Design a protein with these regions (language model features):
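Surface-exposed interaction regions that form or flank ligand-binding interfaces
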Residues: 1, 8-10, 21-26, 32-125
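Active-site-adjacent structural patch at catalytic or cofactor/ligand-binding sites
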Residues: 18
Length: 125
């Protein structure tokens, strides 16, 4: 799983990419999910929880920001409804386009980018 941060006027998108193949089942509150594919069944840690851990770390660095979580599945078929933050890669543009209200002004946007680029621990006002 790889995480990416997209800083925009609409919020700070925190994307966790899941490059899994097969059918994924479970529930959004389960600690582990089941991945079935090619005759093999395996368990993975719930990527929604992993995404939340990444947001928690960013909150410590950036302070209170409008974080928008998303877990993006590149190849898997989702068997269950994992909620609106579980997105197949083909739905990603639609996911982004759903955010239309500006929540971060230009100055704070630049500050967020500077903090992430410099690796400083300055909290935002």
């Amino acid at each position: 799983q790889i995480s990416h941060v997209v800083v925009s006027p609409y919020g700070v998108f925190v994307l966790t990419l899941c490059d899994l193949r097969g059918k994924i089942s479970g529930h959004r509150d389960d600690q582990e999910w089941i991945v079935k594919g090619r005759g093999v069944s395996d368990t993975i840690l719930n990527p929604l929880w992993e995404n939340r851990k990444h947001i928690n770390a960013l909150e410590k660095k950036l302070g209170s920001q409008p974080f928008i979580p998303a877990v993006v599945f590149t190849h898997a078929k989702l068997i269950n409804d994992f909620g609106p933050i579980a997105v197949c890669v083909g739905q990603l543009q639609k996911f982004f386009m759903g955010y239309t209200r500006r929540l971060i002004d230009h100055d704070d946007l630049e500050l967020v980018v500077d903090i992430l680029n410099e690796g400083t621990d300055r909290p935002l006002p």
